[in-house]
Amino acid sequence: MANTRSAKKMVRKIAARTDVNKARRSRVRTYVRKVEEAIASGDKPAAQEALKAAQPEIMRSVTKGVTHKNTASRKVSRLSARVKAMA
């Protein structure tokens, strides 16, 4: 348990930041899921549009400190490869 005033304040700040980061991570997952659903349905134009919407959101999570740069790049790369491989 936090004893000092500053430690108690940090507990509050960390809790608030955690909530924001959870929301950002969830938002990224939603965009990725939309791309994967479009890929699974076999609709290439929809998959391309979903990827176009997901890519900036994934990279935004990097600038906000939620995701590591390499992780985001890997996600974008693998999704775009799967969309490109569609017939």
UniProtKB/Swiss-Prot annotation:
<dbReference type="InterPro" id="IPR036510">
    <property type="entry name" value="Ribosomal_bS20_sf"/>
</dbReference>
<dbReference type="GO" id="GO:0006412">
    <property type="term" value="P:translation"/>
</dbReference>
<dbReference type="GO" id="GO:0003735">
    <property type="term" value="F:structural constituent of ribosome"/>
</dbReference>
<keyword id="KW-0689">Ribosomal protein</keyword>
<dbReference type="GO" id="GO:0005829">
    <property type="term" value="C:cytosol"/>
</dbReference>
<feature type="region of interest" description="Disordered">
    <location>
        <begin position="1"/>
        <end position="22"/>
    </location>
</feature>
<dbReference type="GO" id="GO:0070181">
    <property type="term" value="F:small ribosomal subunit rRNA binding"/>
</dbReference>
<dbReference type="GO" id="GO:0015935">
    <property type="term" value="C:small ribosomal subunit"/>
</dbReference>
<feature type="region of interest" description="Disordered">
    <location>
        <begin position="64"/>
        <end position="87"/>
    </location>
</feature>
<comment type="function">
    <text>Binds directly to 16S ribosomal RNA.</text>
</comment>
<keyword id="KW-0687">Ribonucleoprotein</keyword>
<dbReference type="InterPro" id="IPR002583">
    <property type="entry name" value="Ribosomal_bS20"/>
</dbReference>
<protein>
    <recommendedName>
        <fullName>Small ribosomal subunit protein bS20</fullName>
    </recommendedName>
</protein>
<dbReference type="Pfam" id="PF01649">
    <property type="entry name" value="Ribosomal_S20p"/>
</dbReference>
<feature type="compositionally biased region" description="Basic residues">
    <location>
        <begin position="1"/>
        <end position="15"/>
    </location>
</feature>
<keyword id="KW-0694">RNA-binding</keyword>
<comment type="similarity">
    <text>Belongs to the bacterial ribosomal protein bS20 family.</text>
</comment>
<keyword id="KW-0699">rRNA-binding</keyword>
